[in-house]
């Protein structure tokens, strides 16, 4: 399937749209026209981690590995629109006699400087179910970076769309959230009338939280909680002084920072560990790709990027050298469509 995209003055045909193509991503990228991809989201094979059935990751040295990745990124820069983004998730490597190698950061620094890319964020994926190890001399690694590069400072970025697709705030609401503040009123130095008014306002914010109108809230009560740090004068300090309490309402979503907490995915009856699940990518796609846009994953693996794109009404293109992974990705995509 191909799609005709009509930019300012010419018609562009994009091959391989909504398909997983078995082959070398460097060669396949050459088949794509310039400036046709809205964003790239991918996770290449890690350095000397396991046999992925591909050439990348099996290099003798880290420099050779970074060179292999950079060769592909150069093609990605060509095919990505001027407003597009490139996001790479890369894992690190411990060497027995040399410790942690900082491979992701060496790669990021190399392509940033060599290709003159604009580094937007280093999004840290916090794995809630990291792989355990028996080593007694270091902590379990539970984070991996997603490097968000843009071709220039005029990149597409829709934070509002991202926040709208987050999990419904009204789900899993605690029935006891905020009730402790009512109990704390008895420990405060508030007058009877102040306590009565405070309890009314606390019940009001609890109700807003339970209905999903707030992500979270905090309350400070005079005589119970410490005043504003440093003793700054301002609205909240004045509220504490004059009415005996202040309420901090937190609107929006939790993931406004550069940390995403999410479990690692896996698939039964395969030797492929989905280093990131589709539900994780669904939290990133709306930020960097408009609806009906095109997401490219040059190391598609088990198809997580494609599934996330499908679910969010985006087109995808996937390249994968390992034929077994292609079959797995196709199976998952068809199952997701049914």
Task: List each model region and its residues.
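Core catalytic lobe of class I
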Residues: 2-328, 334-336
């Amino acid at each position: 399937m191909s799609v005709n995209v009509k930019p300012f003055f010419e018609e562009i045909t994009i091959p391989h749209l909504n398909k997983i193509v078995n082959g070398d991503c460097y060669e396949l990228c050459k088949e794509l026209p310039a400036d046709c991809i809205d964003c790239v989201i991918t996770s290449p094979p890690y350095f000397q981690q396991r046999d992925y059935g591909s050439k990348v990751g099996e290099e003798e040295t880290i420099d050779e590995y970074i060179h292999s990745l950079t060769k592909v990124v150069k093609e990605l820069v060509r095919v990505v629109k001027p407003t597009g983004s490139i996001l790479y998730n890369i894992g690190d490597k411990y060497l027995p006699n040399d410790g942690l190698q900082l491979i992701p950061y060496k790669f990021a620094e190399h392509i940033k400087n060599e290709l003159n890319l604009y580094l937007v964020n280093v999004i840290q994926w916090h794995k809630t179910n990291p792989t355990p190890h028996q080593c007694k001399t270091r902590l379990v690694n539970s984070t991996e970076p997603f490097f968000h590069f843009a071709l220039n400072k005029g990149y597409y970025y829709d934070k509002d769309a991202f926040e709208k697709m987050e999990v419904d705030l009204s789900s899993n609401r605690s029935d006891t959230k905020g009730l402790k503040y009512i109990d704390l009123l008895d420990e405060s130095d508030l007058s009877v009338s102040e306590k009565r008014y405070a309890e009314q306002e606390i019940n009001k914010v609890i109700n807003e939280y339970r209905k999903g109108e707030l992500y979270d809230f905090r309350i400070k009560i005079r005589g119970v909680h410490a005043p504003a740090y440093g003793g700054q004068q301002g609205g909240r300090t004045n509220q504490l002084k004059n009415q005996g309490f202040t309420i901090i309402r937190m609107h929006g979503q939790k993931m406004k920072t550069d940390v995403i907490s999410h479990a690692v995915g896996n698939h039964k009856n395969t030797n492929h560990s989905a280093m990131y699940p589709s539900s994780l990518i669904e939290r990133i796609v709306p930020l960097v790709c408009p609806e009906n846009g095109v997401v490219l994953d040059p190391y598609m693996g088990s198809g997580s990027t494609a599934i996330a794109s499908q679910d969010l009404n985006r087109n995808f293109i996937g390249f994968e050298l390992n034929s077994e992974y292609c079959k797995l990705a196709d199976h998952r995509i068809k199952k997701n469509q049914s």
